[in-house]
């Protein structure tokens, strides 16, 4: 197992609201719930459990937000990575509706957490899926019709021609499906804000604490290099970084890499000239 690592250089790290200085875990502790992973999943779980009276210890192998939570594209978008029709064909109408509702609930929860805990993460409403080819334009039309008819989702607008050009200064896109309910934020600052909220709520947060082994029994024992945590419940929230901790889960993990580039600062005037409403934009080419 690799040793702890600092945050990689990135735009998000360079513009973070603060640097973290949580202690490294050592000794022996006991709690109701131990959370492995200091990203959005782990921190949100820890925060909500602590609010309900559980004693929670969170262990992060590197630093808070080190993984995907702190260096993703920052877009918070409705739905999933494929059309709901594909999900419906796999799980059926009823479960597809539940999954759809869950995706909308996650958007609302993000906004609620930002509001309740005054998280400074540059949340901005608005996101657009862009079509480059005529076939993609038709896909966006069908997508909008499906979500309106089957899920009563009426936040979408389909833009073309001059209307589209007035929103984004490029001739590359043929159409854009705009969602006023989605948005974008600074992912690392959002994650750090969740850590602040969790700590204030009473969660014990430790960084640079690699978990070496998990032993199951009447109580679960989480073994680190400098101590162990005994808990009644364990949450594995390490995403693709759970190698060696749970063989059962590891067999089902497929790490996927995405890549993000940042320009030099454009200045507010130039940025607004390019995207007039400051929405997030993503084309629908398959990656």
Where are these regions (language model features)?
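N-terminal Rossmann-like FAD-binding beta1-loop-alpha1 element of flavoenzymes
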Residues: 29-58
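Extreme N-terminal leader/targeting segments of oxidoreductases
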Residues: 1-33, 51
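A non-catalytic, amphipathic alpha-helix used as a structural packing/dimerization or gating element
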Residues: 94, 98-112, 142
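Flavin (FAD/FMN) cofactor-binding and adjacent substrate-gating region
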Residues: 2-15, 82-88, 112-126, 131-193
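Flavin-dependent oxidoreductases
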Residues: 213-287
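Glycine-rich FAD pyrophosphate-binding loop
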Residues: 51-71
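Glycine-rich active-site loop/strand segments that organize a redox cofactor
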Residues: 72-101
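Helical element adjacent to the flavin cofactor pocket in flavoenzyme catalytic cores
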Residues: 138, 146, 172-232
């Amino acid at each position: 197992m690799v040793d702890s690592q600092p945050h990689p250089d990135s735009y998000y790290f360079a513009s973070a609201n603060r640097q973290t200085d949580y202690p490294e875990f050592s000794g022996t502790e006991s709690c109701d719930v131990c959370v492995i992973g200091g990203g959005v999943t782990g921190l949100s779980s820890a925060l909500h459990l602590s609010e309900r009276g559980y004693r929670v210890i969170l262990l992060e192998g590197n630093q808070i937000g080190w993984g995907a939570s702190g260096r993703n594209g920052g877009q918070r978008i409705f739905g999933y990575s494929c059309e709901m029709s594909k999900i419906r064909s796999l799980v059926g109408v009823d479960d597809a509706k539940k999954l759809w509702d869950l995706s909308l609930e996650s958007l609302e929860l993000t906004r609620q957490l930002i509001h309740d805990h005054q998280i400074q993460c540059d949340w901005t409403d608005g996101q657009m899926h862009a079509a480059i080819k005529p076939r993609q334009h038709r896909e966006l039309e069908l997508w909008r019709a499906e979500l309106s008819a089957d899920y009563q989702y009426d936040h979408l607008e389909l833009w073309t021609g001059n209307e589209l050009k007035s929103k984004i200064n490029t001739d590359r896109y043929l159409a854009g499906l705009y969602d006023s309910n989605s948005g974008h934020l600074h992912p690392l600052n959002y994650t750090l804000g969740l850590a602040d909220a969790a700590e204030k709520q009473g969660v014990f947060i430790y960084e640079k604490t690699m978990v070496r082994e998990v032993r199951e029994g009447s109580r679960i024992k989480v073994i680190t290099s400098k101590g162990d945590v005994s808990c009644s419940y364990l949450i594995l929230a390490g995403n693709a970084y759970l190698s060696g901790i749970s063989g059962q889960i590891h067999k089902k993990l497929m790490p996927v890499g995405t890549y993000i580039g940042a320009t030099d600062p454009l200045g507010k005037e130039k940025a607004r000239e390019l995207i007039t409403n400051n929405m997030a934009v993503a084309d629908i080419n398959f990656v």
